Amino acid sequence: MNMQMADVQTRPARTAPTYAPAIDTIKEAVRRAEQRIAPLWPLRYFVAVNPYLGLIDHSFESAAYILARRAGARMTAPRSFYAQAIRSGRITDADLEAALAGGSPFPGAPANVAALKAFALGDEPEPTFPILPTVADAARKVTGINWADVVTDLISTWAGAYFDLGQSYWRSPWKHLPPYAAWRAEAAHDRTPQTRGVHGFRQALREMPESAMETIVAAVEKLNIPINGLEAYLHRLLLSIHGWAAYARYLRWDAELYGGEDHTLTDLLAIRLVWEVALWHSFARKGVADVWRSMAGEYVNDRPDPALQRALAGDLLLQRAFEKAYQRQFFAQLGATTPARVAARKRVQAAFCIDVRSEIFRRALETVTDEIETIGFAGFFGFPIEYVPLAETRGGAQCPVLLTPQFVIAESVDGASERDVNAAIEKRAQNQRVAKAWRMFKFAPISCFGFVGPVGLAYVRKLALDTLGITRPVPHPATFGLDAHTRERVAPSLEPRTLGGRTTGMTLEQRVAAAEGALKAMSLTNNFARLVLLTGHGSTTVNNPHATGLDCGACGGHTGEANVRVAVRILNDPAVRAGLKERGLIIPDDTVFLAGLHDTTTDDVTIFDKAHIPASHTADLKRLEADLAAAGRLARAERSMLLKIGTKTDIDSAVRRRSKDWSQVRPEWGLAGCAAFIVAPRDRNAGVVMNGRSFLHSYEWRQDEGFGVLELIMTAPMIVASWINLQYYGSTVDNRVFGSGNKTLHNVVGTLGVLEGNAGDLRVGLPWQSVHDGEKYVHEPMRLHVMIEAPIDAMTAIIARHEQVRQLLDNGWLYLFALDASGKVTHRYIGGLQWEEC
């Protein structure tokens, strides 16, 4: 960036424009506009992201107005949704009154309950704000052609080829260049703009500088963008290529996380601005400059219609009333049960991810037996690792995307000699090379024709088996290239060694420190059971581009298998336990840790590394597996109602069949419905039926000296939970802008994302089928309700120290409540580091 800035200051003089803002002012507007874009992770580890992330410095209401003007986006459900809730009695007059008490930043908002009900139940039209204009809109006005869509399609076609991660076999010849340079090189040969009628494209390309930042400065001057509206204009342009801008924002996020930098987003903005200049040149004779001059004034004089402001204010009040109704109903359940007395020692302690899907299974397991205590913790279980599969030198980050891996753990083969391990590595690598060559033959542009004729019929049997769910359409990447014998023995290796020039494994001191941190963060420091099961989670689906979005977000879009297997090997290590004992943390000799994986699609739990479990615990293990199987049946029965599986059907078979059905658009509901995040000991809410809508994090503040664990919870899991909640929220209230549309129309592009159909922008967020069942919302849009049992002063101090946390809370992006020792809600956070009694 510094080099680009220097280039801007030393560029050759041009004809003085009629409008020349300071270069530093333009750069700052670029920076702010780019920060407004939320990142989009690629499909290989598709994690939930708050789509409003770049606007959390604004209030929820202010962001609703900004996005309405810049993207034509909604931030509330259709008004009929709230009207139905009022008619059914779900939203009461008391809820409407409570919503009105919070006020509205917009003039003309309904002033009382009667007015708000009349607004909801009346026939006043939904607000449709005019979107801030671009030169493409001005060109449309003088030609009648939707140039904004044309430009988006052409940029998307180029981006799909340039950013391709391995799907295409004919790569862009300019892929080695930075994005803007690559686009310019291709555009110099491409005649598509001229054939589409943009005859000024080549002129624009010639007069624009070669660096992205220089181009942005030149275009801003050329188009006379009002300085007071420059950030809004640039943000508006980025939102016109929202998906690709979001992917570029991810590239920057990832680079900065590891101490680097990335300018892809700036390059994309420059590309979009060149198109603005090209359209300006192309239709100059049709008066586009005059039209643009009059339209650009909206960026300075943004005066919305009072009726539109009133409609927006009313809809936002109805959304708040809907959330007040949820609070009234849910809070009445909390504290209504008597906290269970914890036995001197439980037979099993089972720790699960805080994921809302775990709530149903945990409750089922507690129903099966009261001899098992369940615990909630982020699914990476305090072990932020990069896990490198066998025969690879790089792996995926198995931790929340807010963190970087602290350790590199490589796979090896249990019980094998170094020679045998190397042989297994070579065999897998060879199998992968053969498979890649065969795939290239099948899909390459020329050889594919020779493949279909002579070889196609040989695939009839596989096609039938895949359709029946007996086999997978493609091998699972975790086991691909391994023979059955090796597959059973592949496991993480903790011993330090060198792989690809990097040190893998963990020293004893690192293992002890990691174990201590994990156990304290779980509030698991005493009263250990004979068996302690650490249960990660993953999902089983086929033909699903967004499959990793159903895996563990706390594990970076991977399953939690690697984390729990690493954690268990460390916690069962006698040397580690000796080190923990020196630190005052004593694990009984008869306590054995187990690694398990909860399949959230089928509710089956797999226990790993059984060969390492001592014979003394064989009976305990057998009994636990029976309990887990029984809990799975209960959980499947509960979930079957939402999946619309009939009661006369064999539910277990039907659920498992869905997981293998490649025509199934809803194999499971994921985190749809997520609404609450509870941080407290489990006995405060045990027995409360939360319907898989609550993240449950175990926490005992009396054991948290200095409140370091509380600070970690409020700055990591709470943020991640809000990202998940707001992704579902955005995908529900406006799937066009914040979601990915109809799953049945998806086409994967570059293995990194999806298009809806064969053109248009890269899609962000969740498919419509992930939030709606075809008749009604399965995810009810509401902001996350965070409830924490901890001293209010401690929570307030943490909020004051962390700007992002304070912005989320003070600006109304999530709610925060305090719980007492009985699990009842006692206080709510009202902003400005202040609380009030509920």
From Swiss-Prot:
State its cofactor: Zn(2+)
Source taxonomy: Bacteria, Bacillati, Chloroflexota, Chloroflexia, Chloroflexales
Q: Which cysteines are joined by disulfide bonds?
A: none
Keywords in alphabetical order: Cell membrane, Membrane, Metal-binding, Transport, Zinc
Q: What is this protein called?
A: Probable inorganic carbon transporter subunit DabA
| Pfam families named among the record's database cross-references | DabA
One Gene Ontology term of the molecular function aspect: zinc ion binding
Q: Where does Zn(2+) bind?
A: C353, D355, H537, C552
PANTHER family (alphabetical) = INORGANIC CARBON TRANSPORTER SUBUNIT DABA-RELATED, UPF0753 PROTEIN AQ_863
Where is the protein situated, by its record's location annotation? Cell membrane
